[in-house]
């Protein structure tokens, strides 16, 4: 599922990891324990491909996904819990936005036989197919299910994230990881 082979990480002449190798199989659960500065966060950033090792390689199975919850949260206040959780669906939101743009253009169009109108119809058809394929019709209910499962009440979902403590904000971030 996930293989690390001869991973070396060096910073400014200091070696943090020296040719470490490990394998994680399907269903494995791991915990990283160590003192501050031991490299736990660095290793997780390497595993999520957020950072690159000095040398060595990682191999992931095709459908393998790795996420980690960072220690420091970077929240923009003003979003609701749902709006923040929907950020996990970047591609769906892009497709949805383009669909809305096309609908607005089509509402203003008078010539339904023009080449440009036909091209818009073709693009909209492709977008609709893509939207369905990537789960666009289910992401909202899926998001609610995950958030409720993490302990949020239905009334919480439309509340601003800045009204929640750090622990509850961590749960929102965890929901985003689970939804990706």
Residue map of PLM features:
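ABC ATP-binding cassette signature C-motif
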Residues: 1-180
